């Protein structure tokens, strides 16, 4: 019974978030077709490894491991044209004008971006030089990712160039109208409006500055958040950003206080973290900042512990990145591992695929330094999800991590790239856990029995199919019954699982143990290790003790997302506890879904549905 339940959840997630539209069949891919497309891409690039590739992918077909979800989504022509689409994570300091248009390019490519607005980075930006008032230059925006990125580039340079420039007048006529088909990536064109709004808002920030002044960290941050707004509306992906700032920067610390949601809604696009240098930080300063996090009532601002002032991380904080570096991820399903041999075989297959992914570095548009830095460390991030089922905690994770580094070195040599500087990680796995039917990343299961919900538009073909064939799964959305429905699927945690009723200190100790036994053995070189991405919920009386734990154990994490505990109940919440009787009653009527019956006359895939995780918030679908 449990299998049908998690299969339904998995099939619907894959269909809505990753499957590509096949015009000649008027439907989206099945899991097998999707994985086949991904595997074919690697066989085309590495034909001499075809036998090994097919063997490793036998673990993907059976959902024991997953490759990069970006590579599943964009395998084939999109990645051949733009290999950066394969990567989950990137990081850059905003220390030159190129950063702004590169961030637009990366976000439009579906990549999560970490960026630094620390004072020592932004002070390298040029002084403002207002453009001529009455001299204008028309700029025709190209109808492509590069075209949108170049629009940001020319606008920024018209205010921050080496000499006074003409005022830019943008021409949007070449941009396809809203709803036109996107041939390469799939889905529908957003039309020019999101970009137009972004450029107007960015110009508003620049126009308000005086000649000879500098952009502040908050102004740089806001410009990037406006860029992310255009990407979100552009339908590529819920833009994922993390902004790293100097720990004494009060403007950044308080940028999400007050009624910011109304006055500066763009700031919701980014998680923000103060950078603390491990070797310099005092307990007094740490605790003072921790108190501010508690008093914010929203886990703001985040804290990022660093060993190098120029290094950074990705939005989910699980990857340690040099400036101008990418990382590609893989996932190992450890929820149902049978024994050590099974675990070892899975991590070996994941390391094999991850290393193949690290070979796609023929980037374009970006500065040459991106290719150099990415090839230097050739990072992979082999992650585990389903840790909450507790099976892997009975096994030798160090031995498994050593297999990852060994296999990475072997395959890197075969394909002519460097071995990875950092190999093992734990990502939040908000969406991949739905595909695999596991708890997410390091986190506990929600409950022994619970309902998992997903929202779907009534204009989507899958809604018509579910209504006709599986109407027990679907109901009107309480607040938007006119255009939205809710899919509800009962779920059961494996026997012996860790449940979310555990103490937050149990979660923290598990983070520490996995950091010691999985992350550190997978670290070869670099200032920072990869990280266990985790969200910790704290009740009012737990903040002081948690702050002490964070200080005492600062060697074992780079950043953790901390939120006030929310014991509230909501109508049609993404998760809802139920008892065994209700689980059995709901499960009795379930039957396997056949999504090949979902016929679509045109491509309606929505790439923005794939959540770019940010802490625990990526649990909300």
Residue map of PLM features:
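Extended catalytic cores of very large enzyme megasubunits
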Residues: 1-621
């Amino acid at each position: 019974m449990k299998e049908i339940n998690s299969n339904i959840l998995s099939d619907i997630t894959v269909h809505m978030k990753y499957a590509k539209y096949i015009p000649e069949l008027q439907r989206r891919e099945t899991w097998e077709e999707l994985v086949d497309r991904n595997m074919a891409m690697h066989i085309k690039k590495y034909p001499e490894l075809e036998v090994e590739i097919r063997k490793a992918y036998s673990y993907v077909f059976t959902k024991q491991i997953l490759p990069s979800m970006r590579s599943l989504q964009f395998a084939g022509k999109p990645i051949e044209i733009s290999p950066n689409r394969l990567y989950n994570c990137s990081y850059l300091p905003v220390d030159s004008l190129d950063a702004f248009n590169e961030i637009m390019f990366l976000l439009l490519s579906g990549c999560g971006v970490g960026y630094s607005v620390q004072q020592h980075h932004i002070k390298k930006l040029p002084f403002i030089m207002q453009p001529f008032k009455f001299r204008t230059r028309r700029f025709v925006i190209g109808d492509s990712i590069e075209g949108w990125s170049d629009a940001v580039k020319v606008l920024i340079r018209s205010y921050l160039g080496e000499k006074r420039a003409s005022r830019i007048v943008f021409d949007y006529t070449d941009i396809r109208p809203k709803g036109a088909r996107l041939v390469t990536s799939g889905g529908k064109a957003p039309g020019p409006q999101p970009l137009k709004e972004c450029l107007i808002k960015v110009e508003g920030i620049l126009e308000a500055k005086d000649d000879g002044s500098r952009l502040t960290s908050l102004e740089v941050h806001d410009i990037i958040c406006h860029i992310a707004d255009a990407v979100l509306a552009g339908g590529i992906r819920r833009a994922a950003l993390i902004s790293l700032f100097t720990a004494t920067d009060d403007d950044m610390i308080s940028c999400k206080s007050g009624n910011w949601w109304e006055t500066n809604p763009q700031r919701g696009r980014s998680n923000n973290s103060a950078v603390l240098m491990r070797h310099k930080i005092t307990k007094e300063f740490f605790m003072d900042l921790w108190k501010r996090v508690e008093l914010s009532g929203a886990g703001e601002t985040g804290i990022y512990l660093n060993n190098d002032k120029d290094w950074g991380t990705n939005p989910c904080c699980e990857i340690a990145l040099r400036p101008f570096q990418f990382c590609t991820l893989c996932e190992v399903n450890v929820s149902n591992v049978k024994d050590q041999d099974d675990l070892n075989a899975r991590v070996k297959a994941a390391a094999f695929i991850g290393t193949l992914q690290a070979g796609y570095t023929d980037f374009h548009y970006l500065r040459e330094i991106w290719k150099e830095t990415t090839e230097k460390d050739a990072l992979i991030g082999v992650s585990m999800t389903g840790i909450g089922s507790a099976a892997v905690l009975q096994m030798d994770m160090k031995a498994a991590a050593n297999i990852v580094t060994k296999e990475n070195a072997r395959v890197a040599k075969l394909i002519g790239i460097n071995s990875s500087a950092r190999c093992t990680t734990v990502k939040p796995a908000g969406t991949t856990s739905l595909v695999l039917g596991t708890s997410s990343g390091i986190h506990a299961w929600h409950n022994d029995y619970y309902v998992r919900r997903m929202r779907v538009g009534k204009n989507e073909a899958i809604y018509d199919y579910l209504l006709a064939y599986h109407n027990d799964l679907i109901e009107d959305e309480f607040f938007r019954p006119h255009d939205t429905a809710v899919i509800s699927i009962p779920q059961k945690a494996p026997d012996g699982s860790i449940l979310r009723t555990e103490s937050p200190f149990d979660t923290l100790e598990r983070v520490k143990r996995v950091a010691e036994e999985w992350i550190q053995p997978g670290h070869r070189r670099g200032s920072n290790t990869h990280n266990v991405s985790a969200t910790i919920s704290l009740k009012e009386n737990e903040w002081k003790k948690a702050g002490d734990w964070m200080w005492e154990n600062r060697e074992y994490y780079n950043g953790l997302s901390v939120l006030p505990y929310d014991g509230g109940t909501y109508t049609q919440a993404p998760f809802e506890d139920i008892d065994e009787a209700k689980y059995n009653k709901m499960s009795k009527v379930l039957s396997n879904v056949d999504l090949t019956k979902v016929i679509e006359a045109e491509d309606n895939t929505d790439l923005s549905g794939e959540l770019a995780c940010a802490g625990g918030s990526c649990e909300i679908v």
